[in-house]
A protein has these predicted regions:
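Glycine-rich, proline-tolerant flexible connector loops at the mouths of alpha/beta enzymes
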Residues: 32, 69, 93-99, 119-138
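An N-cap/entry alpha-helix motif that binds or orients negatively charged groups
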Residues: 2-55, 59-100
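Structural preference for beta-strand elements that scaffold enzyme active sites
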Residues: 6, 84-88, 119, 146-148, ...
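Alpha-helix-loop-beta-strand connector modules within alpha/beta enzyme cores
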Residues: 72, 81, 130-152, 183-198
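Glycine- and Gly-Pro-enriched alpha-helical subdomains that act as flexible
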Residues: 124, 138, 145-158, 164-165, ...
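Active-site mouth loops of central-metabolism enzymes
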Residues: 89-104, 146-154, 197-199
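Alpha/beta enzyme core
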Residues: 101-120, 142, 159-168, 182-185, ...
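Active-site beta-loop-alpha junctions enriched in small/polar residues
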Residues: 10, 90-92, 125, 152-153, ...
């Protein structure tokens, strides 16, 4: 078992514990209600081609229509002219250990925004990267640029959770997901107004990501 697989296994245990405290049905209801509220307020609507390509008149029907995933805040932020940077807020990593003992995560995110970052990536994995859901929530509430939840998405629970934490996008890693999961999670993210950053490590995974 490599480190990525090890983290994925630990993440499944962690999310099972969270789901025991807050059932999936409840989390899903809250996340869908938040997206409905955003739609009603005209917040974070997808780029126009979404409806045209999906053949639907409503953004929330795009995933069910099987059309191209929506392009929301995170996608749009990276479409600006010139180089676009996704700047990371990370306290630790398995390879480097503790990176920052003092970790003013909100201050770091604000400095990234002031420096011209297109988006911020926030680690929420607590055991190997010393991340926290609270880091993401507070950063998303403070800065105006979109925030990617950088975690090891292993099930739908984490996608609903990301929505409620204020993330604009989720990370999907090809190496820990099969093709069916990739499609399912991309559609689910789209149905909640979330973009997805798909991580691929080799040519085969790139092909899978582009299907």
């Amino acid at each position: 078992m490599n480190i990525l697989e090890e983290i994925a296994v630990r993440t499944r245990v962690r999310i099972a514990e969270e789901e025991a405290a807050k059932p999936l049905a409840q989390l899903r209801k809250e996340a869908e209600a938040l997206w409905e509220k955003e739609l009603a307020q005209g917040v974070n609507l997808p780029l126009k081609p979404l409806q045209e390509e999906a053949g639907e008149s409503s953004a929330k029907n795009s995933a069910e229509a099987g059309g191209r995933p929506g392009r929301y805040r995170f996608y749009r932020a990276l479409q600006k002219e010139g180089m676009s940077y996704i700047c990371e807020v990370k306290k630790a990593s398995p390879s480097k250990g503790l990176i920052a003992k003092e970790f003013p995560y909100v201050k770091i995110a604000k400095e990234y925004e002031l420096a011209g970052a297109a988006a911020v990536s926030c680690l929420t994995e607590p055991y190997y990267f010393k991340g926290s859901d609270d880091y993401l929530r507070e950063i998303a509430e403070t800065i105006s640029i979109p925030v990617l939840r950088k975690d090891f998405t292993v099930n739908s629970y984490m996608i609903y959770e990301a929505k409620l934490l204020g993330a604009a996008a989720i990370l999907l890693i090809c190496a820990i997901l099969d093709d069916e999961q990739l499609v399912e999670y991309l559609k689910l993210a789209d149905s909640l107004g979330l973009d997805a950053l798909v991580e691929a490590h080799d040519a085969e995974e790139v092909e899978r990501a582009l299907k």
